[in-house]
């Protein structure tokens, strides 16, 4: 499974692509889309949209993972970040990719083992898990961490979704209150 991870931002949007076979991970590509701050908001969003479309076209991922926007103390910043995230979602939808979303806490827990990990810890674990020669840039590391999180957690979620669908169709096994019942 090839996973495209995205760390959305209006100034800098990180992307990272990995291949995952079971628990084995392989680095494919990563980078940061730097958006010129002098551009008007619509043009800034278009830069994100166009660049992520190009990344998806070139790397041909099977699925995408995106970090969920956190609530900031500054509502205006949260709205702007949400718009950058919207541009990323449009690029992924345009590329016909299934999108899975994870909180920063979920991503850090999946990659480092604790949801309270510092950025440097995430960078170090991404470097180790993907056997990279150097430490990835912060935005790229966050995007790669998002992809790694999906590689570890996504298949389990898919199985649970299928079990839930089977329960709705009346076959066994079934889920009740989030628990498997037989």
UniProtKB/Swiss-Prot annotation:
Annotated family: Belongs to the RuvC family.
Active-site residues per Swiss-Prot or TrEMBL entry: 7, 67, 139
GO cellular component terms given for this protein: cytoplasm; Holliday junction resolvase complex
GO biological process: DNA recombination; DNA repair
Catalytic reaction annotation: Endonucleolytic cleavage at a junction such as a reciprocal single-stranded crossover between two homologous DNA duplexes (Holliday junction)
Protein keywords: Cytoplasm, DNA damage, DNA recombination, DNA repair, DNA-binding, Endonuclease, Hydrolase, Magnesium, Metal-binding, Nuclease
Signal peptide (from-to): none
InterPro entries, A to Z: RNaseH-like_sf, RNaseH_sf, X-over_junc_endoDNase_Mg_BS, X-over_junc_endoDNase_RuvC
Entry-linked PANTHER family: CROSSOVER JUNCTION ENDODEOXYRIBONUCLEASE RUVC (PTHR30194:SF3)
GO molecular function: crossover junction DNA endonuclease activity; DNA binding; magnesium ion binding
Pfam families to which the protein is assigned, alphabetical: RuvC (PF02075)
HAMAP family registered for this protein in UniProt: RuvC
Organism: Bordetella bronchiseptica (strain ATCC BAA-588 / NCTC 13252 / RB50)
Manner of cofactor binding, per the entry note: Binds 2 Mg(2+) ion per subunit.
EC number(s) recorded for this UniProt protein: 3.1.21.10
EC main group: hydrolase
Protein name, as recorded: Crossover junction endodeoxyribonuclease RuvC
Amino-acid positions noted as binding Mg(2+) 1 in the UniProt annotation, renumbered to this chain: 7, 139
Function: The RuvA-RuvB-RuvC complex processes Holliday junction (HJ) DNA during genetic recombination and DNA repair. Endonuclease that resolves HJ intermediates. Cleaves cruciform DNA by making single-stranded nicks across the HJ at symmetrical positions within the homologous arms, yielding a 5'-phosphate and a 3'-hydroxyl group; requires a central core of homology in the junction. The consensus cleavage sequence is 5'-(A/T)TT(C/G)-3'. Cleavage occurs on the 3'-side of the TT dinucleotide at the point of strand exchange.
Sequence positions that bind Mg(2+) 2: 67
Cofactor(s) this protein requires: Mg(2+)
UniProt subunit comment: Homodimer which binds Holliday junction (HJ) DNA. The HJ becomes 2-fold symmetrical on binding to RuvC with unstacked arms; it has a different conformation from HJ DNA in complex with RuvA. In the full resolvosome a probable DNA-RuvA(4)-RuvB(12)-RuvC(2) complex forms which resolves the HJ.
Cell compartment(s), UniProt: Cytoplasm
């Amino acid at each position: 499974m090839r996973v495209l991870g995205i760390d959305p931002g209006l100034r800098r949007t990180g992307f990272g692509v990995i291949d995952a076979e079971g628990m084995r991970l392989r680095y494919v590509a990563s980078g940061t889309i730097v958006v010129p701050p002098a551009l008007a908001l619509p043009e800034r969003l278009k830069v994100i949209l166009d660049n992520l479309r190009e990344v998806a076209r070139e790397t041909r991922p099977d699925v995408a993972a995106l970090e969920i926007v956190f609530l900031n103390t500054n509502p205006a910043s949260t709205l702007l970040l949400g718009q950058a995230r919207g541009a990323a979602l449009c690029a992924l939808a345009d590329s016909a990719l299934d999108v899975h979303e994870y909180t920063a806490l979920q991503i850090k827990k999946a990659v480092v083992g604790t949801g309270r990990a510092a950025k440097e810890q995430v960078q170090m674990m991404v470097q180790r898990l993907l056997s990279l020669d150097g430490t990835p840039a912060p935005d790229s590391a966050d995007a790669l961490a998002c992809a790694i999180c999906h590689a570890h957690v996504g298949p389990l979620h898919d199985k649970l979704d299928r079990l839930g669908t089977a329960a709705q169709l009346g076959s066994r096994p079934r889920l009740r209150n989030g628990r498997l019942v037989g």
